[in-house]
């Protein structure tokens, strides 16, 4: 049986270019992905390159607070 709290936590990744740019786009909004990370292996905030449907390109998605 597992001891203590959960090691794997759910995190939300948000597009960094959508939050910075307020350029008039076809669809206004912010791209977000939900994933998991192991708190022991990666204690720092994670950043992944994912596709943003609002920017129409692959951008850096950073972890945000809940």
Swiss-Prot record:
GO molecular function: structural constituent of ribosome
Pfam family, one: Ribosomal_L33
Gene Ontology CC annotations of this record: chloroplast; ribonucleoprotein complex; ribosome
Keyword Lyase attached: no
GO biological process, one term: translation
Highest taxon of source: Eukaryota
Record carries keyword Ribonucleoprotein: yes
Gene3D superfamilies linked to this entry: Ribosomal protein L33
Keywords, comma-separated and alphabetical: Chloroplast, Plastid, Ribonucleoprotein, Ribosomal protein
InterPro entries per UniProt: Ribosomal_bL33, Ribosomal_bL33_sf, Ribosomal_zn-bd
Localization (cell): Plastid, Chloroplast
Family statement drawn from the similarity comment of this UniProt entry: Belongs to the bacterial ribosomal protein bL33 family.
Family matches, as HAMAP family: Ribosomal_bL33
Protein name per the record: Large ribosomal subunit protein bL33c
Source species of the chain: Cycas taitungensis
């Amino acid at each position: 049986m597992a001891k203590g709290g959960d090691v794997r936590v759910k995190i939300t990744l948000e597009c960094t270019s959508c939050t910075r740019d307020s350029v008039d786009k076809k669809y206004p909004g912010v791209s977000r992905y939900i994933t998991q990370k192991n708190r022991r292996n990666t204690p720092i905030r994670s950043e992944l390159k994912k596709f943003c449907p609002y920017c129409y390109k692959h951008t850096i998605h950073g972890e945000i607070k809940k």
